[in-house]
Amino acid sequence: MPFGLSAGSTRSEDGSEAFLEGMVDWELSRLQRQCKVMEDERRAYSKEVHQRINKQLEEIQRLEGVRHKLRVQISIAQSQVRRLRDSERLESMGHLLKCQVRVQAEVKELQAQNQALDREIQEWESRNSAHSKNARSPGCVQHDKVKSQRRIKSLENQLDKVICRFDIQLAQNATLREELDLLRIERNRYLNVDRKLQKEIQLLKDSVRNLMVSSTSAYTVREEAKAKLGMLRERAEKEVAQNETEVQILQRQIAHLEQLHHFLKLKNGDRQPDSAIVEKREQRAREVAEGLRKTSQEKLVLRYEDALNKLSQMTGESDPDLLVEKYLELEERNFAEFNFINEQNSELEHLQEEIKEMQEALVSGRRSEEDRRAQQEQQRAELQQRVDDVHSEADDLEARYHNFREQLEKLKTNIQHLFTRAQCDSTLINDLLGIKTHMRDRDISLFLSLIEKRLVQLLTVQAFLETQVVVMFNAALMVLGQSSEDFPKKVAPPQPPDNLEDPPGFEAKDDYPLSKEELLSSVMKAEQHLKELVESIKVESTPSMTSSTQKVSSSSRLVTQRPSQVPGSIMSHRTSGILVSSGGRATSSNVGHVTFGDSSATTGGLMSSRGSIPGRVTFRSPNSSSYLGSTGYVGSSRDHDSFEASKGPGSESSGGLGSSPGPASSPGPASSTGQASSTSKDSQSNY
């Protein structure tokens, strides 16, 4: 018996070692599979990393090339800008130096001429003193006096010409300064617009750069997600295939174990009792009933013998040692199979749980992928909607731009048509802009300013023509000694505005350009002011109503006692009102070129001559010489000339209607009326 027990134990140890070796082999195969999977993952990850590094290197090289190009462009732009600025500054400095040298030369020339004139004046004064010492005959003295006066007049004329030339140069300098100011303003505007556009371009570049960075990052993230998703799919497919094979193997093993378990159950079930055994039991029972009892030892032996017989009958083996060994071997095998079945059941449950988790993970991954796709579709739809909205808005803006452009072109054509219909002076525009067939957008204000000036001139002429009849009627009443209070009063014509002689391109800050209502209101205010002035003149002239001569002399004294007033002129009250309103100065901004003569008033002043036609008024268009009259040089020279002429023996200073009668004077109302028509014709022809 002890030997049988040791043999059974060795067999059980061999079975456990075989089981452990099987477990080790299975674990080794599992670890090898896991190692292969990890090796595949490592290769995929290394490949992905290499691709990402290559992409980043390519992007770095491209950005380096872009940076090099931008640096080259920036250096070129800076050099060009500097050269342009230097060339512009050199040109402006050269032009200014040339202007300075020319003006200095002209100033020196004028100073030399003034010195020469001073020397001649001193010589003539010394000659006059010498002639006065040498008492000659009255005829010689008169002849010398006439010669000296002629010489003085010629010198004064030369001085006036030089001063006019100097004034012309000053006016040209002023116009050039204004042009430079306008060009400087345009340059500043252009630089501001250029700076704004550069800022917008920089902002757009920054936004494009940010969008590129975000798009590249989103692309890399998308590629990474795609790679990970592909790896997960491959891994899931491999694991699913592996799990399916393992499940099939386990299912086969489970079916085999179930069959074995069923077989063992059937084998261990209750059997039918043997008839011999039943007879022996009945015989034993009869013997016990009869009282034939055996000892316990005998009973135990008999029991063992019966059991051994049963086992020998069941197994067909009569050797008890072999029976024990077979029994132990069967028990160990059953125990090992029981343990194996328990382990397989536990591992099957674990695998089923893992399969369930993997299925849930796959379902959640598919759901998240569907959600992500739905979100991407929604974002794509929103972006498409925004793009459509932006396109529609851009089309609307383009249509509005074309509409406004058409309106602007129509406005420019209408302005040009109005410019030609109004017969505006286009010499200033040709001088500034050159002869062009089309109008630029920035030239509209210049055309409108010239049209407005022409409109003011036409309104002035219209008011003058409307009030001419009333003025002649009032002059006739004053000559006849009557007053115009019983008659309806007419509004005096408006005086021309101060900006008629403004240079081209001049633009006032507050009230320029005026609208139609503002222009009418300003004209009405000027008429009201002139009306008050005329009434004040009439009030001052009422005490001296004794004769028409005293009336005309009192009205002529209002013109700061100028001897150039023509006797019997119908326009005496008109010119006196204008001169009084301007403070006694007949400037070119408030009085046009009023000529009471033929050619003696070439400088624009008010002069009278013996051969002039009294009452003839000529309004000339303002030019550069009339604009220069506002500087004070020409006016002073003309005033001095007219004053000297009034003192001379041959001058005709009219003190009233009765002075220096001749063919040129017509002191009657009829003559004044007749010459008023010539005045209106001359004014219309000049305009």
UniProtKB/Swiss-Prot annotation:
GO terms for biological process: cilium movement; outer dynein arm assembly. The keyword Cytoplasm applies. Residues 366-388 have a biased composition (Basic and acidic residues). Residues 126-147, 363-388, 487-511, 540-687 are annotated as: Disordered. It holds the Pfam family ODAD1_CC. It is found in: Cytoplasm, Cytoskeleton, Cilium axoneme. GO terms for cellular component: axoneme; outer dynein arm docking complex. Keywords: Cell projection, Cilium, Coiled coil, Cytoplasm, Cytoskeleton, Phosphoprotein. InterPro entries: ODA-DC/CCD, ODAD1_CC. Expressed in trachea multiciliated cells. Component of the outer dynein arm-docking complex (ODA-DC) that mediates outer dynein arms (ODA) binding onto the doublet microtubule. Involved in mediating assembly of both ODAs and their axonemal docking complex onto ciliary microtubules. This is Outer dynein arm-docking complex subunit 1. It comes from Bos taurus.
